[in-house]
Amino acid sequence: MQIPVRFKVIFMSFLAVFICYIDRVNISVAIIPMQEQFGWSESQVGIIFSSFYLGYVFTMTIGGFLADRYGGKVILGYGLLLWSLFTVLTPAFAYNGFFAVLFIRVLLGLGEGVTFPSWHSLYARWIPFEERTRSIAITNSGISVGTVFGYLVTTIIIFFYSWEWVFYSFGMLGVIWFFFWQRGITSYPNEHPKISSSELKLIIEKAPTSSLPKKISIFRLLSNLPFIAITIATFCHNWALFIFLSYLPKFINSPVSLGGLGINLDSGIFILLILIPSIFSVISLIAGGFLADSLIKKKYQVIKVRKVLNSVGFFGSAFVCF
C-alpha cells in the first residue's frame, strides 16, 4: 500500500521543526560549560540567548511572503541548510570571542526564522482542511520532541565528549535532512511525480488554495481583530516558551544561593527535570490536535473549538505557574 505523499510532507516538516529545536535548545545546556570556559557573565549569557531572536524575528516576518512567492520547499529547505551550517560553525566563532558568538547566533536565528511560515505555506497547499488541525499538531510536536532530544543528547555528548561536538553532530543532522527533503518534497501537489490521481483530486477538492496569494494592505492586516488576537496570543505563548527553553537548564544547575536548584549537569535528576515538561507537551499537543479535528467533524463551530482549546492551554499554564 502506497503511503500518501502528503503524509511524507507532514513527516519531513515534523523533522524540520525537530531539527529547528534541537539546534535552538542545545546552547541552553552547552552554555553551562561554555560560560565556565570563557568566563562570560550572567548578563553576557542573557545577551547570547537574546541575540538569536534578532535574526529570527526578521525572517519569520517575511518567511511567509517568501514561501508563497518561491515555494515552501525552497525556503524551508535552504533555511534549514543554512542554519545547520551556522550550528556547525558555532564552536569556531565561540573561540573568537563574545561578539563572534553573538554574530553566529544572529545568523542562526535568520536561518530558523523561516521554518514555521514555510511549512504553514506548504500545508495550505498540501493538507485537506479536515486533516489540518492534527497535521499541524503533529508537526508542532516536533518542538517538544526536539526539546527532549536536544536537552538529553546535549547532556550526554557533553558528559562523554565535549560541548563542541554538540554543535558538530546536530548541524550534520540538518545537512542529511536537506538531502532527503530535496529529493522527496515539492512545493505544490501537482508538481510531485509520485502523487496518485486520487490523492491529488482529494487535495484539490479539500484544500483549494491558489498558488498565488491575494494581496492585502498592511493597514488592513494590522487593523484586523482576529489577526490582532492571534498575534497577542502568540506573543504570550512564545514569551513563556522561549524563556523556559533558554533558562530551565541553567535554573536547575545554578547554585541555590543564586536562586537555582544546584543540581549538577551529570545528575540523573537534572536530566529528568529538564525532560518532564516537554514529554507532557508532546502528549497534549497531539491529543489536542486529534480532539479538535474530532469536534469539528461532529459539526462544532471551528472558531469555538479553537477558542476553547486555546483557552484551556493558556489558563492551565497560568495556573501551574502560580
Label every model-predicted segment.
Residues K8-E42, F244-P249:
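Extracytoplasmic
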